[in-house]
Amino acid sequence: MNNEIVNSTIDGVLNTKLHIQNIPPHITDVHLRSLLGNVGFIKDICYFNKSKKQMNNNNFANKKIYNTALVTFNTHEEALNVLKNIKNLIDTSGEERNIDAKFAVPNVSINNNNNNNNSNTFFQKNNMNNTNFSQGSTNYGSNYNSENFQGNNNMNNYNFYNNNSSNNNNNNQTNTQNNFMNRNMKNKNMNNNNNNNNSNNNMMMNMNFNNNQQMNNNPMLNQNNFMLNNNNNYNNNAKNVNDMYRDGEMSPNHLNNNNNNINNNNNNNNNNNNNNNVMFRQNNSHLAQMYQANDNSLEDVENVDGLSLWEMYKDKNNNIFYYNNLTKHANGINLFTQTNYSSITIMKKQNKMDLVEVTYLFSTYLVNGQTLIYSNISVVLVILYHQKFKETVLGRNSGFGFVSYDNVISAQHAIQFMNGYFVNNKYLKVQLKKGETVENTNS
């Protein structure tokens, strides 16, 4: 079917994902969702926006910035219709580049008979004492500013779909393409005979702290990321979490107490099922359509000061959950009870916190088990410095502190994703430091 269209099927499965390139700078992710949503139902969208500030630093002051997006449709026919009519849907007259769309192909490394367990490690045992985030020592800073989204450097972590598949038979070489935000990737590893350890495949960070003790035992690192749908945990005969929630078979509370029942039909990956407290997706059609219809109300989304993207809902069992209007994901309230209290106790006894501990505060104290928020902020979490989180006279943490980022976009994203987040019976208030302008990066 549709043999004339390249990659319209992947291993016999109809492709529903489109990789759209050369999106004009005036077309935001909200506009793109609205335009394409008129043609077909959009299940998911990843919008990769290049910052003008970053481009200016690379002497591209007079160059237009064209963006890229990965869009997942409900059916193959809808994706095909958009692909054929993309130039009519999005006006690119007067632009330097013509918009281009093609079926997306998973960027999968095929390493037959290779049991390398470090294939998807984002940070690989970097010593925080010697780490310079602005350089390439972490394979982060230099690649974040890179314009080459199709190169062989680690920027492939942000460009998940290209037509290059590596055929690497070297068992000693580490593949750093972690597919950081691959969403709903079904049949991704059908040709891969590896029996990789899932806890390492889904590891977002593997830092070596000052005491050289790795974070491999941190519960957060062994949990599947909400954007990483590792379909090794589901077979073709089992319903996924989204379908079960949509059909009313499970609630947010049910997610945590009965998560082991999801994988009863899978005999290949039973060793990590207890760590699958995944942030469930809210796929109800009315919520998605509501998001697409509210184009005008979301046009000012970049004005993030004081904006809360979290809304409180109740399911049919009167269980409270929280829905994020931007990421279209929801959190069950009892997930917050999984906080690592031993880590909190240790931090309360400390008189001050250094850079490593502040990073650990974000990843463990606030969002331990909350891979949703951690994934949102980890892409921009490049902290330059911080001030101590002060405590009151009674010895209780006031929850007050300053964190500085290396660029404006990172600070704005931190505000956008964290402000209004419900944790420890309070709503986080994240905003620019008083007296600071948008040019400054304190939040």
Swiss-Prot record:
Gene3D superfamilies, per the entry: 3.30.70.330
CDD domains according to UniProt: RRM_SF
Keywords, alphabetical: Malaria, Repeat, RNA-binding
Domain RRM: 16-106, 342-435
GO molecular function terms listed in the Swiss-Prot or TrEMBL record: RNA binding
Pfam families, per database record: RRM_1 (PF00076)
Biased composition annotated in UniProt, kind: Low complexity: 256-277
Annotated region (Disordered), positions in chain: 253-279
Protein name: Clustered-asparagine-rich protein
Source organism per UniProt: Plasmodium falciparum
